[in-house]
Amino acid sequence: MLITGMLRTGTGTGTRGPARAATGLATVTLTVTSAMLAVPLSLSLVTPAWADDGQCTFPSTLYAGRPWALQRVNLDELWAQSTGKGVKVAVIDTGVDVKNPQLTKAVDASAGENLLPPKNSKGETIDRGNNQGTTDTVGHGTRVAGIIAARPAKGTGFVGLAPDATIIPIKQNDAEGDGTAETLATAIRHAVDKGAGVINISQDTANAVAPADSLQQAVDYALSRKVVVVASAGNDGLGGNVQITYPASYQGVLAVAASDRNNERASFSQSGEFVGVAAPGVDMISTVPGKGHCSDNGTSFSAPYVAGVAALLKAKYPQWTAQQIVAQIEQTAERTISGHDRLVGWGVVDPVKALTDVDPEHPVETPKPEGGVAKGEAPSVAPLHFGETADERNTRLGTYVVVGGLVVVAGLGGSAVAVRDARRRRGRVTGAGGAGS
């Protein structure tokens, strides 16, 4: 089956053609080999077209400070609970470059896979890179992986939320959209079979389409094995647009919207009832191929923020199901209303609260509205009196009597002391005169 669609390209190396820079769109032809896929489906990296402003050239310089998305978290308190050690997180993306020093020891290349075909549907040779998925000519997957599990390094305050988790690199897509629903489904199954506890998918369908059976079955395969599947909600939210995207909309998948520095939905972030939570997705610092960092925007970088939290929970509570981990993240999210809304889901993820506000023996199965923001109590208003009440008058007069009495007593006491002192002085004068005669 031959499918023609529109691909919203993600950020590349900072050099895109004039048309691409203006529109962020490129026409692509996708060959889908699955007989089970009955509808057109194209996949896209979930990064706004306007996000690529030239900052994401690579290799790059180090970002010296602590990014705002990490400043909002007490990392010492968070990592006292869990660092993600022992948990594998699959990054299904454009590959993960292990030459960046913060990712070299974070990536398990032996478990990686490259699912891009040798040639595209036009018969043109694709620059696939190695078979382990550890080459990334786009830079997208490398940034995603860094947000999850980048190791601490001198000269930068950037680090992954789960700095001891292990990344499984799966190269399944590229800047031209050569990934398909079939290869995405294969990637999910590969991740599960290689022992992933969490899967991050920062891509979605470019157009609203019906679910694909092969993709749905792959997601179900992961969930049945307690694997948490996190997916970006998409970046078609400008103007309040609501568009259902996959795999984010599948039952059991934690769909992540993007929030800004004010814990509000980022303007581009996709809205919908399928949104589970939101996470920082504006001015997101992360690793790039080779070395260094860059800043980017998009739900592509909100999803790995949540995947990192999921890895922390998975390491601390390995017996929990995927549903319980997702529910815990949703239940403990920061929100301004008691329930769910289609902009930020159950709220903006709170990593520390997700790890500390928990009953290990009774994990949350589904988020509850009453567990969100408590409603404020009505203020207690004092009675309004025009003029002085009888009680107030009695209190005032009583005060006057007491104060007046104290003044009189003090005056009398003072007079007595004065008389006494005067008598003593006269006595001393008289006594002094007799002695001298």
Protein language model regions, located:
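Active-site core segment of subtilase-fold serine proteases
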Residues: D53-D164, D193
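Secretory targeting and sorting signals
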Residues: M1-D52, V401-D421
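Cytoplasmic C-terminal tails of single-pass
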Residues: R424-S437
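Hydrolase catalytic cores
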Residues: I147-I148, G281-V349
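Short helix-loop-beta-strand segments that form the rim/entrance of peptidase-like active sites
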Residues: D93, G157-A175, I199, T321-A333
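Substrate-binding/access-modulating region of protease and related hydrolase catalytic domains
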Residues: Q172-Y246, G292-N297
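C-terminal subdomain of the subtilisin-like protease fold in secreted/lumenal serine endopeptidases
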Residues: P318-L412, A432-A435
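Catalytic-core environment of secreted peptidases
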Residues: L116-I126, A258-S300
